[in-house]
Amino acid sequence: NNIPLLQPVKLNDTEFVEKIQSLNPDIIVVVAFRKLPKSVWSIPKHGTFNVHASLLPQYRGAAPMNHAIINGETKTGITTFLLDDNIDTGSIIMQKEVEILHTDTLEDLHDKMMVVGADLAVETIDRLTAGDFTAINQETIIGSDTELQPAPKISKEFCEIDWNNNTVDIYNKIRGLSPIPAAFTNIKTANGNVLSIKIFKTSNEIAKEAKGNHSEKLSNNKKNMGNTNKD
């Protein structure tokens, strides 16, 4: 389709900025990308908006879907918002909720959010070009008692299971990191070797137990793996 592909090392590079300016874009759409400098996001006449995988202002950051599942949320959503100088703090254009089932993994949620996000992006473009929207400043919906949940980048250390945690927390962590980057644990073999094992899912029975009772144990799993958890 003869669409130009630009991959600058530095987003504020003069040549890159001038190239974007020469394209004279009406709108710039950002999805899962690093922070754009003002020299870029201020170019389009209808603005630059981001498609973010949470109901902002909750879960600002690089891994909103992971952290929503890990924290046991039952809903999340997609937010489109106008870019500003900070990360995920711009004025909200549109939002749409997405249910998180108790058995949803990151992959399951991603597939649902992908469809909703695409539709919301198209609707947002239509509203921006028509001027049919009222941007909502995020600060106006953050109350004095609002506890904002962050969504920082997932580190390798974060992925290791802490068996001192309760069943629900362990279960949510496994599904919130599945399939990538995946939760893991280390076990020692009979000959003294230490193996690192990735865990992609737990049984449906554990899911049912964890949903109703935080004190239930991962009895079968912990025996097989040589681990015990807090419960």
Q: Locations of the language-model features?
A:
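An anion-binding loop in the catalytic cleft
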Residues: 158, 162-231
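One-carbon transfer enzymes
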Residues: 1-181, 193
